[in-house]
Amino acid sequence: MAKTSMKAREAKRAALVAKYAEKRAALKAIINSPESSDDARWDAVLKLQALPRDSSAARQRNRCNQTGRPHGFLRKFGLSRIKLREATMRGEVPGLRKASW
C-alpha cells in the first residue's frame, strides 16, 4: 500500500492539471505558433513558467486504484500487476484468465 500522503499528492496534482489545462494549452499555442511575434512568444514563455509546477500533466504518475502502487501499473485496467492477477484469479475481470499451454 502506498502512503496516504502520496495518494493525496497525486490527487492534488490531478486537480491542478485540470484547473490550469486551458491556460497551459493557450500559452503553448502562442509559443508554438509561427505567426506569433517574438515579444508575444517570450511573454507566453514567462507566463507558462509562472504557473505551478504540478499543473503540468507530465508530473502525474499512474497509480493502482486499489493500492496506490506506482510501478507495474496496467493502464487498461487501472490496477497494478499484483491486484490484476488477484482479480483475475477471482474471476472478476471478464475475458481474462490464467494462461495455460
Curated annotation (Swiss-Prot):
Record SUPFAM superfamilies: Glucocorticoid receptor-like (DNA-binding domain)
Q: What are the protein's UniProt keywords? A: Ribonucleoprotein, Ribosomal protein, RNA-binding, rRNA-binding
UniProt-recorded Gene Ontology molecular function terms: rRNA binding; structural constituent of ribosome
**Highest taxon of source:** Bacteria
InterPro entries from the UniProt entry: Ribosomal_uS14, Ribosomal_uS14_bac/plastid, Ribosomal_uS14_CS
UniProt entry tagged with the keyword Ribonucleoprotein: yes
Family note: Belongs to the universal ribosomal protein uS14 family.
Provide the Gene Ontology terms for cellular component: cytoplasm; small ribosomal subunit
Known role: Binds 16S rRNA, required for the assembly of 30S particles and may also be responsible for determining the conformation of the 16S rRNA at the A site.
Q: Name one Pfam family in it.
A: Ribosomal_S14
Q: What is this protein called?
A: Small ribosomal subunit protein uS14
Subunit text: Part of the 30S ribosomal subunit. Contacts proteins S3 and S10.
Q: Which GO terms describe its biological process?
A: translation
Q: What is the lineage of its organism?
A: Bacteria, Pseudomonadati, Pseudomonadota, Gammaproteobacteria, Alteromonadales
